[in-house]
Design a protein with these regions (language model features):
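Short, ordered loop/turn segments at secondary-structure junctions
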Residues: 11, 69, 110-113, 219
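Glycine/charged-rich beta-loop-alpha catalytic/anionic-binding loops adjacent to active sites
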Residues: 18-20, 76-80, 187-190, 209-217
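Generic structural signal for residues in well-ordered beta-strands
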Residues: 40, 64, 146-150, 214
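RNA substrate-binding interface of SAM-dependent RNA methyltransferases
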Residues: 73-166
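Active-site/ligand-binding-proximal alpha/beta "capping" segment
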Residues: 165-204, 212-215
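Structured adenosyl-cofactor binding patch, chiefly the S-adenosyl-L-methionine
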Residues: 201-244
Length: 244
């Protein structure tokens, strides 16, 4: 049986004890039904996995003793997805699935055709919601580092500030397939995916002026979340193959 993995936002030390309370306590007790003496792994976004066991259980907290720690190195290359905010569950699905695929960072965008209402969407609350999704997905997919979820910015600001070595914008009208552009690992890669209404011609042109390569994922018209998953999956395969 797989060990429980739990993210803890506090310092952890080998040989010490941790009291798991509040939401994490509820998750362990009610959802995972964790028991005394059960083995568990805690991580806190430092690269260390702390292997321990549940030493004591009360009605308010789990007391966990940390027995050993193991360090997992970060990849030397990074991948970022920049996506126009879309209707839920689209955005949530992108955060969840790309976290599982090992994405390093998310950059939410507002573009010309983004389905976005500032009066109805609390961006700070949305950011916190996405972080919770990424934590849950990191626990499930055995990541030791959480992805970075950046503050929402405009399409133009992103284009102006992007400094990745490889810069890709998905475009259904492009004659250039993604494998013709990205076929070997680079130090950093950013993938730009548009909203349900696509990017405007002006936005595609602006991205091209800043050295973004326009690529296609094939003949089919894909949903935003499908396109994001397909592109990042392909890049992950290319990057992973060069590790062998």
């Amino acid at each position: 049986m797989r060990l429980i993995r739990l993210y803890i936002d506090e310092p952890l030390n080998e040989g010490s004890k941790v009291l798991v309370k509040n939401d994490s306590f509820h998750y362990l007790a009610k959802v995972l039904k964790a028991k005394k003496n059960q083995k568990i792994i805690l991580f806190n976004n430092t690269g260390f996995d702390f292997h321990g066991h549940i030493k004591n259980v009360t009605d308010r907290y789990f007391e966990i003793h940390l027995d050993k720690r193991f360090f997992l190195e970060k990849n030397m290359y990074t991948t970022e997805i920049a996506f126009s905010i879309c209707k839920n569950p689209c955005s949530d699905f992108i955060i969840k699935k790309l976290t599982e695929l090992g994405i390093n960072s998310f950059q939410p965008l507002i573009s010309k055709f983004s389905i976005f209402n500032k009066k109805k969407i609390d961006l700070e609350k949305k950011l916190k919601h996405w972080k919770n999704i990424s934590i849950s997905s990191s626990e499930q997919s055995e990541r030791s580092y959480l992805p970075i979820i950046k503050n929402t910015i405009s399409f133009q600001d992103y284009i102006d500030s992007c400094s990745s070595v490889s810069k890709i914008i998905l475009n259904t009208k492009s004659q250039n397939m993604i494998n013709n552009v990205y076929n070997s690992r680079t130090e950093s890669c950013s993938v730009l995916v548009g909203p349900e209404g696509d990017f405007s011609d002006e936005e595609y042109s602006y991205a091209k002026q800043s050295d973004f390569s326009s690529v296609s994922l094939g003949d089919n018209i894909l949903r935003v979340e499908t396109a994001a998953i397909a592109a990042i999956s392909y890049i992950k395969i290319i990057n992973s193959n060069e590790n062998k």
